[in-house]
Design a protein with these regions (language model features):
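N-terminal lobe/hinge region of extracytoplasmic solute-binding protein
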Residues: 45-95, 218
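Aromatic- and charge-enriched surface segment that lines or borders ligand/interaction sites
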Residues: 89-140, 177, 264-267, 321-324
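Alpha-helical secondary-structure segments
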Residues: 117-124, 173-179, 221-222, 250-252, ...
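Surface-exposed binding/hinge segments that line
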Residues: 122, 127-129, 136-201
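Gly/Pro-rich hinge or "lid" segments in bacterial periplasmic/extracellular proteins
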Residues: 173-174, 180-248, 252, 270
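Ligand-site clamp/hinge motif
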Residues: 241-286, 429
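Detector for C-terminal structural segments
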Residues: 335-365, 411-420, 441-557
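Structural transition elements
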Residues: 351-390, 409-412
Length: 557
């Protein structure tokens, strides 16, 4: 998501070499100044209408941006994306790295004023794991003892029997004991992740659509939602029941949903928006130079999904045969000139991909995990043609019509038109189709496509956040990939307590993935956001979320 996620046996270096979270428009000490001169209200174009605001269901960065500001986990993340106390004031970790005992702050409350207890976390985490919830992100909690068995239950009766065996127990109102199946080097950071946020059992069970209405959405973060107009705006206001409310300076954030980049840019330039999530690609170079936009590092990869599941046969049996041909997939990968894409199309500081796992994650020896080049970033047309011929389609002869699906937001059209032209050079012609973001997510998740835009922003700073999404049982496996050898390596890496061996296993897993090429990496991502110079203290994380808990307005004319 989409996108730093300790004392224990398999601790590894979690520092991302691409940098820390960045504070926008904030000079030293300035953040602590009194902010009485300006109205503390901010208008931010989110550029999307989130599919959901339910932390258990959300799987997209836009939803996580809102969730990160209206909810709060056991831990928060500092500006290095490392765990610090959040709803929990402290914790202890057992010597074997398996048991975490969290102690909640006293007198925590929901935004409606009702008490928040450790049992709310127990309920929320088990709700994510409950098969009935169908959470795409349930895999992020499978580190917990008994979680995998509960999540895999086939019947309501089986789920009920396995629920109590999950290693999450509220022993009193302020104590939560968590038992892991194996030591996890980034578990504390995970508790700051969207899927681990608490929800109110009372609210959830009273209304299945609780997260779609400001009147029913109850949260526990620095802000609360007070208005939700579909495809128009979401309004957040300061949560007076937040434990750290005195540090929150903004009174109101209006999040707009203008999806067309050029329209959003025009509104930003005219002063209608104080901040925009995406800058029109045609404006990026000049905007960054003029300091009306800022490019931030992102621990993420953009790629193309190839549907290798049996479901693609229902769309077109001929397309299924082609897409199931590994030589064909490798040909497509080698025909793409990623250097041209990042220099002439995206133009926002991205770097051409040569692997799936993003650059910026260090191994135990301090070296970047991503060092092996699986293909030439600038492409290799001759190699692509050779692979296409070996696949049985010399110069594209005999290929059926193929369709690539993408969502048009964020300038994706220009990217996929460029790829379409590159593939034509080896004789592969594809039709481009678009779907708006919410529909696109549903189509992709249900495997009702041939090829589609894919993107992944790390949930924590470890290669596993990229590697385990392609396990055959992963809800995030939106391509239907199934390789038993790959699954075995990932499972072994998760159980391995020797950091060096664990990284070696993940390297081998990526070797298999890139040989099979069910996804085609394009580039390592960045974020370019428009931020007015009077907007201070906004923190943009390489993992995706944008934090407004320390933001304020100063010097706005």
């Amino acid at each position: 998501m989409k996108t730093s996620k300790v004392k224990q046996l398999c601790a590894v270096a979690l520092a991302a070499t691409l940098g820390l979270s960045v504070l926008a428009g904030c000079g030293a000490k300035k953040e602590e100044k009194a902010t009485t001169a300006a109205k503390q209200e901010l208008i931010y174009n989110l550029a999307a209408d989130p599919k959901t605001l339910d932390p258990a269901i959300n799987q997209a960065v836009d939803g996580s941006i809102i969730a990160a500001n209206i909810f709060s986990g056991l831990c928060d993340l500092d500006d290095k994306d490392k765990a610090i106390p959040g709803q929990a004031e402290k914790w202890e970790v057992s010597a074997d790295g398996l048991t975490y005992t969290f102690h909640l702050k006293k007198d925590l409350k929901w935004s409606n004023g009702e008490p928040l207890k450790a049992s709310d976390f127990e309920y929320s985490w088990k709700r994510v794991l409950d098969p009935a919830t169908a959470s795409v992100y349930s895999f992020q909690l499978l580190y917990i003892k008994g979680a995998a068995e509960f999540n895999a239950a086939k019947t309501p009766e089986e789920a009920k029997a396995k629920r109590d065996a999950v290693g999450v127990k509220a022993t009193d109102d302020t104590t939560l004991v968590v038992t892991l199946a194996a030591p996890c080097p980034y578990f504390l950071e995970l508790t700051a992740f969207t899927t681990y946020f608490p929800v109110s059992q009372k609210v959830v069970e009273a209304n299945k659509d609780w997260a779609k209405d400001a009147k029913t959405l109850v949260s526990n973060g620095p802000f609360k939602m007070t208005e939700y107009k579909i495809k128009d705006q979401i309004v957040l206001e300061k949560n007076e029941n937040y434990y750290n409310k005195d540090k929150v300076k903004l009174d109101k954030i209006t999040m707009k949903m203008v999806t067309e980049d050029t329209s959003a840019w025009a509104s930003y330039k005219s002063g209608q928006f104080d901040m925009i999530d995406k800058v029109a690609s045609s404006e990026i170079v000049k905007a960054v130079k003029d300091k009306t936009a800022i490019t931030f590092p992102n621990l993420g990869t953009q790629f193309i999904d190839i549907n290798v599941s049996d479901k693609v046969k229902d769309i077109d049996p001929n397309a299924a045969k082609v897409l199931g041909n590994v030589k064909f997939r490798q040909a497509l990968a080698n025909a793409i000139d990623r250097k041209t894409i990042v220099e002439n199309v995206t133009k926002s500081g991205q770097t051409p991909a040569f692997s799936f796992v993003s650059t910026g994650i260090n191994d135990p020896e301090g070296k970047d995990f991503t060092s092996k080049k699986y293909f030439e970033p600038a492409g290799d047309i001759e190699k692509a043609k050779k692979l296409l011929a070996e696949a049985g389609y010399p110069d594209g002869q005999g290929l059926p019509p193929l369709v690539v699906l993408y969502n048009p937001e964020g300038g994706n059209g220009e990217i996929y038109q460029a790829i379409q032209d590159m593939w034509k050079k080896i004789g592969v012609n594809v039709e481009l189709q678009t779907q708006e973001w919410k529909v696109f997510q549903t189509t992709r998740n249900s495997l009702k496509y041939e090829m589609a835009r894919g993107a992944w922003s790390a949930d924590y700073a470890d290669p596993m956040t990229f590697i385990d999404m392609w396990e055959s049982t992963s809800p995030s496996n939106e391509i239907g990939y199934n390789n038993p050898e790959y699954d075995k390596l990932v499972a072994s890496a998760k159980a391995e307590t020797d950091a060096k061996k664990r990284f070696e296993m993940m390297h081998k897993a990526e070797d298999i993935l890139m040989a099979d090429m069910p996804i085609i990496p394009l580039y390592y991502a960045t974020y370019t956001k428009g931020i007015k110079d009077y907007v201070k203290g906004v923190r943009v994380s390489p993992l995706g979320p944008v934090y407004f808990d320390k933001a304020y307005i100063e010097g706005k004319k």
